[in-house]
């Protein structure tokens, strides 16, 4: 037939059997990729330190999605929350991966069967004897079935009625675990950070889908609407399906980048806005203040800060710090976190506590500036020593650590003080192992960043696909050269282009 590469899908345009076949094969490829990717990630994943080397630091992409749906155990004897387990059951990470691969194989065989046996009676219109699909009826069936699945997920899986529940955590990503969730039917259900909204929205949307599906199965579309929206044309289905997909892709790009109950920070890493707003820093200072109010010493108060909370308050975990085209996991960038050194408190020779101004997200380098409690600059690391007035040496800055590995250690040597001041720009200070993975020291993004970029990019692409195929199906007659206002009798076959007398064929 000699079709160009971008027109090859026209071979299934009027062939319902093979149209079904290629869609089953597509499902086989998607499920096969998911299962294979899960097995690859499990082969390289190190579950030994869920606090300082969680899945998102290791660049895991499909493991977080399995985990948020209730999978936490491995046939390797480990649990995602740490520790060992003896009986993971069939629905472990490997079990889910295997199920996808088996399903992929079955879909592969089904696709081959439908490609060979394409001319089935079910696709034949008994009135004309030609292949045809009752698209409004198929729409009703699909809407009904997806509504049942949606309702079932919300009413059974999420609520724990028949299923594990979903991953639920506190606002600071410290206590996450899989647990049943009760539907939130009040206004709080519309808060994107309330897990109960996931249950209630799936129940509500599923109910609507079931009712809408039954409606479309029992009511035929009016003739004018059927013709106006080209409901008999398979390209209409393609166009509206693309619209549904690109809309969903834009939505999930937003929920991933800005954060929501569906994208817990324990599984996907923190968002950039938590660094921008000093979210974890404020909570750490609140906890320290509460400790001091209980008559704890500064050292004791800082020692009570969970290492997990301190690790979130580090710029290397900000997904916006990694360039889009820097391949590899976060661990391949700044290294594998080994331990928290503690919180550095800087003081000048007059005893004032100084705070290092933190690096904003979109800076690669930033001046080291130390300010007092009133925001007045008291010390810095100058660019030109000759003009300096606030250098560490001149001001006599010292640093003392509270909590962490260096608890109680203090330094007055200017070179050491400056080293820790530079590192304090990046948030809490951690010891990082760059040797094991030959990490290059250049920040990488987390799976949160990759997911957002991928889905926003494909959503834009699919938006244009929707416009393209929508225009093709609505204006098919115009593109074919048939003018709806043509009142002259057209002799088909007389012209190379229908209705265009300038292209009259020559008589042989």
UniProtKB/Swiss-Prot annotation:
Record InterPro entries: PS_antenna-like, PS_II_antenna-like_sf, PSII_PsbB
UniProt keyword annotations, A-Z: Chlorophyll, Chloroplast, Chromophore, Membrane, Photosynthesis, Photosystem II, Plastid, Thylakoid, Transmembrane, Transmembrane helix
GO molecular function, one term: electron transporter, transferring electrons within the cyclic electron transport pathway of photosynthesis activity
Membrane spanning residue stretches: 21-36, 101-115, 140-156, 203-218, 237-252, 457-472
Membrane topology summary: Multi-pass membrane protein
Top-rank taxon, per record: Eukaryota
GO BP terms in the entry: photosynthetic electron transport in photosystem II
Main location: plastid
Cofactor-binding details, from the entry: Binds multiple chlorophylls. PSII binds additional chlorophylls, carotenoids and specific lipids.
Keyword Repeat: no
Subcellular location: Plastid, Chloroplast thylakoid membrane
GO (cellular component) term, any one: chloroplast thylakoid membrane
NCBIfam families (UniProt xref): PS_II_CP47 (TIGR03039)
Family: Belongs to the PsbB/PsbC family. PsbB subfamily.
Function: One of the components of the core complex of photosystem II (PSII). It binds chlorophyll and helps catalyze the primary light-induced photochemical processes of PSII. PSII is a light-driven water:plastoquinone oxidoreductase, using light energy to abstract electrons from H(2)O, generating O(2) and a proton gradient subsequently used for ATP formation.
Assembly and interaction partners: PSII is composed of 1 copy each of membrane proteins PsbA, PsbB, PsbC, PsbD, PsbE, PsbF, PsbH, PsbI, PsbJ, PsbK, PsbL, PsbM, PsbT, PsbX, PsbY, PsbZ, Psb30/Ycf12, at least 3 peripheral proteins of the oxygen-evolving complex and a large number of cofactors. It forms dimeric complexes.
Name recorded for this polypeptide: Photosystem II CP47 reaction center protein
Species whose genome carries this gene: Acorus calamus var. americanus (American sweet flag)
Lineage: Eukaryota, Viridiplantae, Streptophyta, Embryophyta, Tracheophyta
Gene: psbB
